């Protein structure tokens, strides 16, 4: 195991330390068919994985899921169990990707990869998906990228997104939340938050596609926001849910007060992971059916 003192200086060690947590995630549903693909991207081919149930019919809706990892770690394998679970629960085509990571590739590289995969989904229609029914979800840094992707798609004429699932997102580069100092989540505190901002945002800390809490959120798709109590990003997610409601966005906010940051990946350790995935699948399916109603935090 890497020396924790080195984690802020060596992103490679961060990645090794994160892999030690993979034991907490159950293997996903092996009945789900998968296909690894390379998606053309502005920064080169993007590794992606397409998930589908064996009984999938053409015209199914789709979900793009964006992994977390503090913008410096993770890949398509990181959320494999959750992505399989979404495909099984919703009957949608689910796509995960390995976007470019900081510090080698700071903003906007990772967001551009997400944009390119979303556009590929809408234009190439893998597994015969319905391009008019695409949802996006993500956790932690991927939650940030989920909101940024919706903003850029709204403002740049990108593919229509029908629903957002936003798990314990990073939203505020000012790090003004005292949760960064008081959270009891091991190994994640203010120093780690400052490191993340430094290597990912660099000089773009005020860009609303990075500090998404400060963006104009009006007109975003219906959203489900999941927050947790033992988390330095607790307030980041709560404030985002409140800002979405204030912007008139149909928003469901569920707070898991007893859960730590990253709990979606801890399916071996807690039933809450599957419960939250059930909720995400349910709300996304309602959006696909056009029956989602306005709920607020």
Regions found by a protein language model. Give the residues of each.
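Gly/Ser-rich "nucleophile elbow"/oxyanion-hole loop immediately N-terminal to the catalytic nucleophile
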Residues: 122-136, 156
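Catalytic active-site module of serine/aspartate enzymes centered on a nucleophile-bearing elbow/loop
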Residues: 269-297
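A glycine/proline-hinged amphipathic helix-loop "lid/cap" segment
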Residues: 1-53, 288-297
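Short beta-strand/loop motif that positions the catalytic acidic residue
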Residues: 225-227
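Proline/glycine-enriched tight loop/beta-turn segments at coil->beta junctions
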Residues: 44-46, 53-62, 218-220
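Alpha/beta-hydrolase active-site loop
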Residues: 105-125, 280
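Hydrolase active-site cap/lid region
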Residues: 151-205
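Short amphipathic alpha-helix adjacent to the substrate-entry channel of hydrolases
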Residues: 77-97
């Amino acid at each position: 195991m890497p020396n924790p003192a080195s984690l802020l200086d060596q992103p490679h060690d961060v990645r090794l330390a994160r892999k030690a947590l993979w034991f907490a995630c159950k293997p996903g549903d092996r009945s789900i068919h998968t296909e690894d693909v390379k998606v053309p991207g502005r920064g080169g081919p993007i590794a992606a994985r397409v998930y589908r149930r064996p009984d999938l019919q053409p015209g199914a809706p789709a979900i793009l899921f964006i992994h977390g990892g503090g913008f410096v770690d993770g890949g398509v394998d990181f959320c494999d169990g959750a992505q399989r679970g979404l495909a099984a629960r919703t009957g949608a085509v689910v796509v995960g990707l390995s976007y470019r990571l900081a510090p080698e590739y700071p903003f906007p590289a990772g967001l551009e990869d997400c944009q390119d995969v979303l556009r590929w989904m809408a234009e190439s229609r893998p597994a015969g998906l319905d391009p008019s029914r695409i949802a996006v979800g993500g956790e932690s840094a991927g939650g940030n990228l989920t909101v940024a992707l919706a903003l850029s798609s709204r403002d740049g004429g990108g593919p229509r997104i029908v629903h957002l699932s936003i798990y314990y997102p990073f939203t505020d580069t000012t790090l003004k939340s005292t949760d960064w100092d008081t959270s009891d989540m091991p190994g994640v505190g203010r120093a780690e938050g400052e490191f993340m901002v430094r290597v990912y945002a660099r000089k773009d800390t005020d860009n609303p596609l990075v500090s998404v809490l400060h963006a104009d959120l009006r007109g975003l798709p219906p959203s489900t926001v999941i927050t947790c109590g033992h988390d330095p990003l607790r307030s980041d997610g709560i404030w985002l849910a409140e800002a979405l409601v204030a912007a008139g966005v149909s928003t469901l906010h569920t707070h898991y007060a007893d859960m730590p940051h990253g709990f979606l990946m801890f399916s071996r350790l807690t039933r809450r992971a599957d419960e939250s995935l059930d909720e995400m699948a349910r709300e996304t399916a309602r959006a696909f059916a056009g029956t989602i109603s306005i709920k607020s935090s």
